[in-house]
Amino acid sequence: EGANGSPVIVGNIRMGFGHYRISMAMASAAHAMGYTPYWLDLASFKDATGSKVIRYQNDLYSKGSRISQRVGAFNKLVWEPLNSEGFRKLSYNAADQKNAELCVPLFHDIDKDIPYVGTHVWPSQAAVHAGMTHVVNAIPDNWPMALHLAEGSIHTVQTPSAYLGYHQLRGMDPARQLKPM
């Protein structure tokens, strides 16, 4: 039957080719199901504070990634622990939630009831903070990390083990056992 051209917004940050590919895949799938996908790149608004923060974080992450490829000690002592354990902690997510609020003005003229798929947690968090009512947070990683949580959205994952890890908030607070979502 299809969606008869109903709109769906694909929210993204175009942070690296991987996130761009995920966004293109979501837009393509939506189109194949009969939706009209609209691309919302939160990093593309030149003067918006939220966009500037995303671009700065992207630059910082890219720099860290390049250094980690060239300097083994940096990779072992800083980069790997940050990416495997630092982003996993629930406390890390709190700062991202505040940063996402800076993107709320970008949603000012968007109908809050249009279905929305965030292909990174920041667009998902921003959409929730902006009052969007049908937000899907497409989680790209199978390693459960609090970085990927967007409270108030529907979280999608790729595997049963990822589902269990996110459902149980596995390892997101090393000091205590968290209650399942």
Residue ranges and their predicted role:
Residues 101-115, 124-136:
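Glycosyltransferases and closely related glycan-assembly transferases
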Residues 119-121:
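Short His-centered aromatic/hydrophobic patch
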Residues 7-12, 116-117:
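Short hydrophobic beta-strand segments
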Residues 131-181:
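Active-site-proximal region of nucleotide-activated glycan assembly enzymes
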Residues 24-105:
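Conserved N-terminal ligand/cofactor-binding loop architecture of enzyme catalytic domains
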Residues 19-20, 123-126, 143-145, 163-164:
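Short, well-ordered alpha-helical microsegments
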Residues 13-22:
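A short, glycine/small-residue-rich beta-strand->loop->alpha-helix junction that serves as a flexible
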